[in-house]
């Protein structure tokens, strides 16, 4: 397993309090603790590879060698790996004000029993790349007021797999770990996801108990109370009031029924068409041919009925009358 050599620096960058220098392969990064609340231009100190790492009061500032990217890490972050291009920087938590070399508690190094002073000094100058097991005991995501947020189900799942992934491949970057954990979470069994949801709810309850000032008594959103607020205090009606209400309802019902019947009758009168008068059968009159009309097809030379006989003068007179 790769390791980092830590050397103390005491004669570099006068005016700043040096902390330590980290050698990782060909890269050498110098860490300096700044006494200013904000970073100023004089706080930036260039190392051998022109990369800049500066400790602030509450943050760690890192600038890439080509000055194309800047990263700021807030405390506490323990041992964190940050990726820039094709090389990594491992930074340590800020040590105490008095010593110049990081203490064992800060670096997470356990002192073996029976070791001499030289072995202890040599072990204090080595930082293991493996993250400590208690690195994610508290969430590093903070709210605007500085209080850590409760961890959700995915964050708990991420932290549960982190030690296993680092033990299998210590060279994994944060981006690769996030991609791997996301793929495992999407293919995880629903029962396992339900278990992590329960753990997340327990985390919320713990966070509520530790930070009651963040949870006011009156919630902003409606709760999932099985009993609605309108059912918590049942309405009690006396028998006298009940009878009075029933009589009022009967009166209103009768009035509404009468008004409804009148409206229906008026509507039926308007909509229903008037019935037509009945017409009797057409009378069957006998056709009587008038006797003064002569059929032109009748042969006058043939003997006719004496009642219908006409003289020649009558016939001529009739024809002239018809012609005029």
From Swiss-Prot:
It comes from the Eukaryota. Residues 147-215 bind DNA. The keyword Acetylation does not apply. PROSITE patterns: HMG_BOX_2. One of its GO terms (cellular component) is nucleus. One of its GO terms (molecular function) is DNA binding. InterPro entries: HMG_box_dom, HMG_box_dom_sf. Pfam families: HMG_box. Keywords: DNA-binding, Nucleus, Transcription, Transcription regulation. It is found in: Nucleus. The keyword Zinc does not apply. SUPFAM superfamilies: HMG-box. Disulfide bonds: none annotated. This is Mating-type protein A-3. It comes from Neurospora crassa (strain ATCC 24698 / 74-OR23-1A / CBS 708.71 / DSM 1257 / FGSC 987). The gene is mtA-3.
